[in-house]
Amino acid sequence: LKQNYPNPFNPVTRIEFSIPEPARVSLKIYDVAGRLVDVLVDETRPAGVYTETWNGRDRLGNAAASGVYFCRIVAGDLVRTRKMVLLR
């Protein structure tokens, strides 16, 4: 899981990640309190390099507030988290 770009961002950021073998991939956004904000990926993917976009909105389409968010990927045994900053 690479660092998102741009960071800080407004209104959109890109998140790049790679998986070395086919795996169930979960890529989720959390706020600083640990609450789930959005789910970007939740499916099985073949090995490869991927780029996902987060539009700074929650699962209901509401604009997320300015602040720190965490992007967490789980793919097989891989678990990584990166910090992102949304500036409105």
Q: How would you label these PLM feature ranges?
A:
Residues L78-R82:
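Extracellular and select intracellular beta-sandwich modules with Ser/Thr-enriched
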Residues M84-R88:
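Short beta-strand edge segments in extracellular beta-sheet folds
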Residues L1-Y5, F9-Y30, V39, W54, ...:
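Glycine-centered coil/turn sites that cap beta-strands in beta-rich domains
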Residues V41-G76:
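Short, surface-exposed loop/turn motifs with a glycine/proline- and acidic-biased composition
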Residues R35:
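Conserved Rossmann-like nucleotide-cofactor binding loop
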Residues D31-V32, D58:
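Short, acidic, Ser/Thr-enriched surface-loop or helix-capping motifs
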